[in-house]
């Protein structure tokens, strides 16, 4: 919790996003073309925006699987896309059920044909 000094106002210990003292421009925290070089340089402890990072595509909207978007958005492939999705879902569900084992029989699985 922040300590409130006796004067009644909070004082920031680091003003990384403020302009340099003596600036005649506005109070904005962004640099401007009129006053180049006034903004305080990037703090070394903060990460820089680098489009080379793996997570950059989440923010800039780059699709990592462009062929999937084309197939799923195409009306002529809508039935085959839905069929393959349901098949994959069904297969995954069967595999998940197959991996479950009853508590009394540790060596046997519950999926598959039962011997008669």
From Swiss-Prot:
Residues 23-32 have a biased composition (Low complexity). It comes from the Eukaryota. The modification Phosphoserine is found at residue 9. Coiled coil: none annotated. Residues 22-47, 92-116 are annotated as: Disordered. GO terms for biological process: cell differentiation. Keywords: Developmental protein, Differentiation, Phosphoprotein. Pfam families: PPDFL. Probable regulator of exocrine pancreas development. Belongs to the PPDPF family. This is Pancreatic progenitor cell differentiation and proliferation factor. It comes from Bos taurus (Bovine).
């Amino acid at each position: 919790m922040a300590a409130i000094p006796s004067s009644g106002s909070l004082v920031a210990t680091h003003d990384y996003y403020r302009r340099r003292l003596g600036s005649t421009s506005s109070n904005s925290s962004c640099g401007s073309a009129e006053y180049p070089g006034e903004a305080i340089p990037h703090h070394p402890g903060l990460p820089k925006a680098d489009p080379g990072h793996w997570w950059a595509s989440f923010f800039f909207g780059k699709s990592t699987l462009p062929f999937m978007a084309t197939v799923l958005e195409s009306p002529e492939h809508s039935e085959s896309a839905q069929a393959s999705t349901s098949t994959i879902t069904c297969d995954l569900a069967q595999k998940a059920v197959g991996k479950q084992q009853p508590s009394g029989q540790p060596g046997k699985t519950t999926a598959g044909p039962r011997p008669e």
